[in-house]
Amino acid sequence: MGINETTYRYRVQDKYEFGKYEEPIQYQLALLYEMPISRNYFEMWMAYHLTNTILFSPAVELRTVSYDDARTVFERLVRMIRQRSTIREIVNAHMISQENWRRFRSPEDNTREMMEIFLGRFDDAEVPLAAQACQNWSLERVKVNGKKVYQLVIGDEPNTTPVDLLGTTVVECRDFYDAVSNHPDLIPTVVSNIVNLFFGDNPSVDKQSIINDIVEDNPETFNAIFMNLLFSKAFLVSVERPKAFEELFFSCADKIDWYAGSSFFKYLNRSRVGLWAVNLNNTKQAAMTYKLGRPVAVPLDTLSFAYYHKAVRERM
């Protein structure tokens, strides 16, 4: 079922206040709260979950990252999911983006992390070869419109020496990213991350069996992975897990006809807060914030859970 998404976007802008800098994330939270269940909502919901994983987190906690990067990463995911782009195409577009380089900032760091995050490869010997291919890519601080920002710069002296890497021959940096996005380990690694997101450390579920079943179906899109997972018997019947704040709070709000005030989202996901604040940062569930994504399991240490409980009890 389709909806007029533009209507809800205007409604969110008119109805709510947002922070000067944090608006890109607060706006997405408000939009997910306001919109009804629909195909549009499901596509945005998938993108939101992906931006909270190690796969696509914008990592706004880093000084090299801006809050606008969170909007860019989220909207690119939504757009490509709606275009029915494949997982490999989406991963490739993300890896070559400035937003990704603001998260992992040098050829050595970026290439190492791409192999670890998307392929589950932890071979130190491969890093110098990958960094050689990306030797002319760098993140530099430059002045744009009178303001200093971190910008991806691609130099005019690319690597010209072929290297054997990831089962193929790589010369330039884009060759490396193509090798990662086309590698046979990409889909199993992505599926594993998404399964961990929904099953956490649940000992009653055989996660590897679930991962194998999904991979055997040869999913080409994120829609295929999420649909397979959400309608699996393991998820519908067997899984027992603490719910993330948004999952619990938004659901309860709908059931009891509770409505958020104009400044609710402005303070719900704010970067600088005191220990007294009811805020996703204090529950360790901040959206699109952490360099390595949200914790796989909802944090239930004493302090984090106390803030979680306080947020649900006092804000609703």
Where do the language-model regions lie?
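N-terminal accessory alpha/beta regions
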Residues: 1-82, 98-103
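Second-shell loop/turn segments in exported
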Residues: 31-37, 55-64, 73-80, 99-101, ...
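Loop/turn elements at helix/coil->beta-strand transitions in domains of secreted/extracellular proteins
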Residues: 42-44, 83-90, 123-125, 186-192, ...
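Glycine-rich, acidic and aromatic/proline-enriched surface loops and short helix-turn segments
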Residues: 44, 48-59, 83, 93-100, ...
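Flexible, low-complexity segments enriched for small/polar residues
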Residues: 54, 183-316
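Short, solvent-exposed loop/turn and secondary-structure capping segments
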Residues: 59-66, 101-107, 141-149, 204-207, ...
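Activity-critical C-terminal alpha-helical subdomain
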Residues: 84-142
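Nucleic-acid-contacting surfaces of polymerase cores and analogous helical-repeat interfaces
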Residues: 109-112, 118, 129-202
